[in-house]
Amino acid sequence: MIVRRALALAALALAASPALAAPERPTIVVGSPDFRPLPIAVAAFQGEGDAGAAATQTAEVVRADLVLSGLFDVLDPRGFLADPAEGFAAPSIRFARWADVGADGLAKARVRRGPGGLEGELHLYEVRAGREVLVKLLRVDGADARSLAHRMADEIVRYYTREPGIFATRIAAIRRGRGTWELVTQDMDGGNQQVLLSERSILMSPAWRPDGREILVTSYRSGRPELWAYRFSDRAFRPLGRQRNAFGGVYSPDGSRIAFTVSEGNVTDLWVMSADGSGARKLTSDPAIDVSPTWSPDGRRIAFVSDRSGTPQIYVMGADGSGARRLTFQGNYNQTPQWSPRGDLIAFTARDERKVFDVFVVAPDSGAISRITQDQGRTNEEPSWAPNGRLMIFRTDRNGGIQLVVSDARGDRQTPVTSGKTDLAAPAWGPLAP
């Protein structure tokens, strides 16, 4: 995979700042023999007034985010040689000292309290060229230093990759309590967890609407599985459609349709309906069990699980239900497919002969399979892709307890994003923040 840092206007300047020159960006080739993370220094952020603690936390989270991305070699601040009190204007920065510690990039920031929230003034420099290349003023509501940090990290990633960052995104999941099921969301790195909904009936399979305004879930509030939607604007929780025994709903990439599963007697088929719950119709009519639909990013195909071959396998068909073909031929228990937003891979869970569950990816056209996890606990399952298609999150029982882990698309870097034991299930990575 290639992440380009090519010629482009780099400066998104403050109104009061002078225009910045458009720098030449070197190219990062991710996954190739030539790839190396960009060495970057994140200096101690300057807190104005009573924002000192917020500035410290913001810098720490920015560093952690950049490490998690896998694109950067984030240098240890204990080895910095530069004067912490040096200014922000390029002439006041001793770039040679930053170069001496191995930095190619340098991030600095001011953090202060503004009307209704925190403000951060992010400055980014190319050390070897000795110039400032980005100035960005960011604001968040309240005193949420983590959110400010995620937005800063997103800007740094955007500068170097010309792609949106994913650090301000949220993860939805289901948490089982004592007699309750909760729909929760959290930052992609595990922070800022919030309970959206607490039910005494089963909740399953959260799925985000592409615009992030709603989360679709399977609810047993009526005693049987049905599709319900949680709306953020007014916290409403309402049923969608009239199908009973409906579960596992997922929005199409444009948000106009929902694919889902209906179980009627001994028949379990895939259906589709409009996003408002109208116009439901069958997509499959096979005697086998068809479940777990996932859309291709162009909305033209659907991958799903079927046991029509005798064991659960991944299949792909047209979004109208036509042309179903088997995709996986290895293993005898493959489930929970998730199509990458980049379109090049489908992540899924497979169980081997030892009854161990692991995460794999398969190319939707060639059927080539790669393994993401191996000998890392007995359960690695329920993968969900980040909106950039470069990272995924899944559930694992490694290290003696259930955790959520973020991995790259090759499984080379796997980072726990929940501390200790957690009872979160069915993680669903949300869309890019507006």
Curated annotation (Swiss-Prot):
Region (Disordered), start-end ranges: 411-434
GO cellular component, one term: periplasmic space
Keyword Iron-sulfur carried by entry: no
Alphabetic keyword roster: Cell cycle, Cell division, Periplasm, Signal
Major localization listed first in the record, in broad terms: periplasm
GO terms, biological process: cell division; protein import
Localization terms from the record: Periplasm
Position of the signal peptide: 1-21
Domain of life (superkingdom): Bacteria
SUPFAM superfamilies xrefs: TolB, N-terminal domain, Tricorn protease N-terminal domain
Keyword Cell wall biogenesis/degradation: no
HAMAP family linked to this entry: TolB (MF_00671)
Subunit structure: The Tol-Pal system is composed of five core proteins: the inner membrane proteins TolA, TolQ and TolR, the periplasmic protein TolB and the outer membrane protein Pal. They form a network linking the inner and outer membranes and the peptidoglycan layer.
Family: Belongs to the TolB family.
Function according to Swiss-Prot or TrEMBL: Part of the Tol-Pal system, which plays a role in outer membrane invagination during cell division and is important for maintaining outer membrane integrity.
Protein name, entry field: Tol-Pal system protein TolB
Species the sequence originates in: Anaeromyxobacter dehalogenans (strain 2CP-C)
Gene transcribed to yield this protein: tolB
